[in-house]
């Protein structure tokens, strides 16, 4: 496979996995050893109290541990619930590589108080029962879960996470991860689909100046409906009439539904079309509407887009460039920020990266959140699983240095929820063809529209039942 074809294929899988991510223990012994600080963070009450032993830890002050931290071996083990051989393996492997490169650099520079972080990835095959099985297999070996692919998959293990008092970082942008009714053991990151819709539709409306109507269509499930609900709220706040309602109407595997949605958008004559689905389904809907003369401005949740839509051999590349706007969660490859530049250098120096794929940065973001939690737990003197979770939930700010918008894990739902889109961009086929970037013309960075800023977030925009 030629290099350009190879990375376009990976980009295609990127869009597919991010869309599909929103598809439709007993007592533990706790050991205390010598460490830098005797202060401990109060652990969540869900965990079972366990007997405590004390051992000597050399120069470290008193450090409490239970599962996944071995002070004698000098290791911290973090699990990854990742699709490594299923339909989204090529993308998840990129994200896992990002984590591996990040932690290799941390370990080479002293680790966490001299402790080396070891990743334990297990293959969930993007299957809910397998995710549960893999969790059960590693639950007695890891201090936390640094990556969990898929919203329903993460919900399926959430009760066990709470039983174990264990932290996990989901790989989706469902707004429920910012809802304290759901997220006792989960760490959100990135602007949720719901608020992303407000940012992007607000930006498009302001840019157009004269838009009065919008067509909205989506996949079913948390991914599509979280975004759909955000688009409806954006329309109301902006005074846009919703002239086509395709709530959960898209089945990416059923071409008939794509045609029905395309026809509905065309018939509505909407000024703006917000379509949240997979990239392949988006391309089909876009192309069919274009062929019928539709001239509105397009967008959707970020997973609806990937650069394959503007590849040199794409029949819709020029129309996509002329009539669509998008957002990103982390920043993009080539962005002039310290965080992006540092991550890019580490990736290129690793010898495992030869194409500009921004998905690596997602691995860095996940790893940096876990790094902050582990470091705080170490500083607190409590590296039990409950201690790591408590430390994570005490983080007032995780600063990504421009890699992505900073995150906070204290305060109310409304105070914690991410409102900032990493970038607003337009597709750039010429830049993509050059092979030097992923084809984004960045229009705004760290963007928050006034309607998003004013939105009162108290609970998930869409209820995903476990």
Language-model regions: role of each:
Residues 17-20:
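C-terminal motif of bacterial Sec signal peptides marking the signal peptidase cleavage site
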Residues 22-30, 37-39:
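Bacterial lipoprotein signal-peptidase II cleavage site
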Residues 56-63, 399-466:
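Solvent-exposed, acidic/polar segments of extracytosolic/periplasmic ligand-binding ectodomains
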Residues 60-72, 79-100, 122-129, 149-152, ...:
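Extracytoplasmic "Venus flytrap"
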Residues 63-66, 90-97, 109-180, 189, ...:
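Beta-alpha junction/loop-to-helix N-cap segments that form part of ligand/metal-binding clefts
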Residues 130, 176, 184-293, 334-335:
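Extracellular/periplasmic Venus flytrap/periplasmic-binding protein
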Residues 220, 229-232, 279-284, 331-394:
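Extracellular/periplasmic ligand-binding modules, especially the Venus flytrap/periplasmic-binding
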Residues 289-364:
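Extracellular/periplasmic periplasmic-binding protein-like sensory domains
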């Amino acid at each position: 496979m030629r290099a350009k074809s190879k990375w376009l294929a990976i980009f295609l899988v990127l869009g597919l996995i991010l869309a599909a991510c929103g598809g439709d223990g007993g007592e533990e012994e706790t050991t205390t050893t010598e460490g830098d600080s005797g202060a401990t963070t109060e652990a969540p009450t869900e965990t079972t109290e366990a007997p405590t032993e004390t051992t000597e830890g050399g120069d470290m002050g008193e450090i409490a541990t239970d599962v996944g931290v071995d002070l004698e071996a000098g290791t911290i083990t973090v699990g990854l619930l990742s699709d490594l051989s299923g339909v989204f393996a090529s993308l998840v492997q990129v994200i896992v590589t990002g984590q591996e490169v990040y932690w290799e650099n941390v370990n080479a520079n002293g680790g966490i108080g001299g402790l080396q972080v070891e990743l334990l990835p297990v293959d969930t095959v993007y299957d809910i029962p397998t995710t549960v099985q893999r969790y059960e297999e590693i639950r007695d070996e890891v201090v936390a879960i640094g990556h969990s692919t898929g919203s329903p998959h993460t919900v399926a293990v959430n009760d066990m996470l709470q039983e174990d008092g264990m932290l996990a970082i989901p790989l989706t942008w469902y707004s429920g991860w910012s809802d304290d009714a759901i997220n006792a053991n989960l760490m959100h990151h990135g602007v949720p689909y719901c608020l992303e819709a407000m940012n992007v539709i607000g930006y498009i409306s302001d840019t157009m100046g004269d838009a009065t109507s919008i067509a909205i269509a989506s996949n079913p499930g948390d991914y599509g409906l979280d975004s759909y609900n955000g688009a409806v709220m954006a329309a109301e706040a902006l005074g846009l009439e919703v002239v086509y309602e395709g709530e959960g109407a898209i089945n990416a595997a059923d071409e008939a539904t794509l045609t029905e949605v395309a026809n509905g958008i065309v018939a509505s004559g909407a000024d703006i079309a917000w379509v949240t689905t997979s990239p392949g389904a988006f391309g089909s809907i876009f192309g069919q509407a274009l062929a019928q003369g539709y001239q509105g401005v397009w967008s959707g949740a970020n997973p609806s887009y990937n650069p394959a839509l503007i590849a040199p051999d794409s029949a819709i590349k020029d129309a996509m460039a002329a009539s669509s706007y998008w957002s990103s969660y982390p920043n993009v490859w080539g962005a002039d920020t310290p965080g992006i530049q540092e991550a890019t250098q580490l990736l290129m120096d690793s010898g495992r990266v030869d194409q500009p794929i921004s998905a690596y940065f997602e691995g860095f973001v996940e790893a940096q959140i876990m790094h902050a939690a582990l470091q705080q737990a170490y500083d607190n003197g409590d590296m039990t699983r409950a201690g790591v979770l408590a430390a994570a939930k005490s983080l007032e700010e995780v600063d990504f240095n421009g890699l992505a918008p900073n995150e906070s894990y204290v305060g109310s739902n409304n105070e914690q929820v991410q409102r900032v889109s990493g970038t607003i961009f337009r597709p750039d086929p010429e830049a993509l063809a050059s092979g030097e970037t992923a084809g984004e013309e960045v229009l705004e960075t760290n963007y928050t529209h006034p309607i998003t800023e004013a939105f009162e977030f108290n609970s998930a925009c869409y209820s995903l039942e476990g």
